[in-house]
From Swiss-Prot:
Its cofactor is Fe cation. The keyword Transmembrane helix does not apply. The lineage of its organism: Bacteria, Pseudomonadati, Pseudomonadota, Gammaproteobacteria, Legionellales. The gene is sodB. Pfam families: Sod_Fe_C, Sod_Fe_N. Coiled coil: none annotated. Keywords: Iron, Metal-binding, Oxidoreductase. It comes from Coxiella burnetii (strain RSA 493 / Nine Mile phase I). The keyword Oxidoreductase applies. This is Superoxide dismutase [Fe]. InterPro entries: Mn/Fe_SOD, Mn/Fe_SOD_BS, Mn/Fe_SOD_C, Mn/Fe_SOD_N, Mn/Fe_SOD_N_sf, SOD_C_sf.
């Protein structure tokens, strides 16, 4: 089964002025596409060829893992943003954030710190463990919290290709822009599932 580059859940210019059309053209159309194409080449003729993406992530390593995880991480990341995003979470998610982190502001500060201070390429995550406890963490390169038994709720890509066109080396500005488009409905859906 060949994997395909999924369409973005919005138009290329829909996240402007926070994330530019040019960034999405390169990030989605070139970087994400390259992960999908490389993954398909690597799994061709192997037992992974018929496996679902999440199983490949759990069972593989090396190049297959890196490209499978980057495909999953990016697909998830696109849905973590919306042109109607930003603002604050509500309902059960807001309550869980308050209970775990003390307040939305404290959660945002912790997540922002995790994203801004992550050394090198990787991802900042809001996850839920098997006991339903929320946690902020960062992973290096293509790592995905699923490999540690944690459920991703939200992620911010902190690879330089995610922001260099728009903010050059100013990752904090990019992370601030990310907050303006966070898709809390998607995060809530992940929290409830």
């Amino acid at each position: 089964m060949a994997f395909e580059l999924p369409d973005l859940p919005y138009k290329l210019n829909a996240l402007e002025p926070h994330i530019s059309q040019e960034t999405l053209e390169y990030h989605h159309g070139k970087h994400h596409r390259a992960y999908v194409n490389k993954l398909n080449k690597l799994i061709e003729g192997t037992p992974f060829e018929k496996e679902p993406l999440e199983e490949i992530i759990r069972k593989s390593d090396g190049g297959i893992f890196n490209n499978a995880a980057q495909h999953w991480n990016h697909t998830f990341y696109w849905h973590c943003m919306s042109p109607d995003g930003g603002g604050d979470p509500s309902g059960e998610l807001a309550s869980a954030i308050d209970k775990t982190f003390g307040s939305l502001e404290k959660f945002k500060a912790l997540f922002t710190d995790s994203a801004n201070n992550h050394f090198g390429s990787g991802w900042a995550w809001l996850v839920k463990d098997n006991n339903g406890k929320l946690e902020v963490l960062s992973t290096v390169n293509a790592r995905n919290p699923m490999t540690e038994g944690k459920k991703p709720l939200m992620t911010c890509d902190v690879w330089e290709h995610a922001y260099y066109i728009d903010t050059r080396n100013d990752r904090p500005k990019y992370v601030n822009n990310f907050w303006q488009v966070v898709n809390w409905d998607f995060v809530m859906k992940n929290f409830k599932s």
